[in-house]
């Protein structure tokens, strides 16, 4: 009975999408024509931070190094902010270096950003193939992927295969200790996408996001991070109503610097938790 009802709902939704296809097409073209194209922010895309005033050896390295790599699309690249300091990585690095657990476990944080606007899961996979293997294994790799797959003609099967391949190359070539996939954003809430197109795009994003979550659950040391957007709004509003558009950049599509800050906080919390857990496993 339940299965029959689900099938009926799918048929109804499919029929609705067929009827609304001309509207979706018109709105999609209008968005491409009218939406402001924001550039990737200027700023450093790699760096080294010394923790606890730890000395650097003659080779430029200290004893315990945390190697962090952020990979992905325009959100990882920080589009929507003016500089990399105001972007996801720019917020993430100082938050991480202030964590007592990071300071006690590591002397140095090496970080790099490998992200490009418009990249799909296939583009990211290709980038990981092209990049040289690191001289040291990557302790944490954070991936932002899926939005461009949602807006392109990537099937659910293609998405699943490409995510699996990303996991394989990250672990094999980069020696990734902890791999974190960030959840897809709530695309139906993006100010730049009008109704009814927003619901159509949001539904496809949800399908890819659910698939991503399931894939991550089948692999060791691969984590799906469900970004808590409600928490971001609650922390910013402090109990008073706010316009959700403050969380988005001027294009109504990418995160604002404000959202990047809240997002980075959640990513940092997860990284600390994962490193603590993996260190405990290694020592037991």
Q: What do the predicted segments below correspond to?
A:
Residues 121, 125, 160, 164, ...:
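Short, amphipathic alpha-helical "lid/cap" segments that border enzyme active or binding sites
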Residues 174-178:
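A short helix->loop->beta-strand "cap" motif at the edges of active sites that frequently abuts
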Residues 233-246:
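Short, flexible, mixed-charge acidic loops at enzyme active sites
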Residues 65-69, 75-161:
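Conserved SGNH/GDSL esterase-like catalytic core that processes O-acyl groups on lipids
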Residues 189-228:
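Substrate-gating cap/lid alpha-helix
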Residues 144, 182-183:
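Alpha/beta-hydrolase-fold catalytic nucleophile elbow
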Residues 1-68, 268, 272-275, 280-284:
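N-terminal secretory targeting modules
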């Amino acid at each position: 009975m339940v299965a029959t009802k689900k099938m009926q709902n799918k048929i109804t939704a499919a029929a609705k999408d067929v009827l609304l296809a001309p509207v979706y097409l018109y709105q999609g073209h209008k968005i491409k024509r009218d939406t402001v194209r924001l550039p990737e922010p200027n700023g450093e895309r790699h760096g080294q931070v010394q923790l606890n005033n730890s000395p650097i050896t003659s080779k430029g390295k200290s004893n315990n190094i945390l190697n962090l790599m952020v990979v992905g699309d325009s959100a990882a690249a920080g589009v929507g902010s003016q500089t990399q300091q105001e972007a996801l990585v720019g917020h993430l690095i100082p938050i991480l270096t202030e964590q007592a657990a990071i300071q006690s476990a590591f002397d140095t944080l090496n970080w790099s950003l490998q992200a490009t606007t418009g990249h799909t899961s296939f583009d990211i996979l290709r980038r990981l193939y092209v990049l040289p293997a690191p001289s040291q294994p990557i302790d944490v790799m954070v991936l932002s992927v899926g939005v461009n797959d949602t807006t392109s003609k990537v099937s659910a099967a293609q998405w699943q295969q490409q995510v699996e391949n990303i996991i394989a190359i990250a672990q094999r070539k980069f020696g990734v200790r902890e791999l974190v996939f960030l959840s897809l954003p709530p695309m139906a809430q993006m100010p730049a996408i009008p109704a009814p197109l927003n619901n159509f795009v949001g539904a496809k994003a949800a399908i890819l996001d659910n698939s991503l979550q399931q894939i991550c659950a089948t692999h060791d040391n691969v984590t799906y991070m469900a970004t808590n957007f409600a928490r971001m709004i609650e922390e910013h509003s402090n109990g008073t109503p706010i316009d959700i558009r403050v969380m988005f950049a001027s294009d109504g599509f990418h995160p604002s610097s404000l959202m990047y800050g809240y997002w980075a906080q959640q990513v940092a919390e997860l990284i600390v938790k994962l490193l603590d857990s993996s260190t405990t496993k290694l020592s037991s």
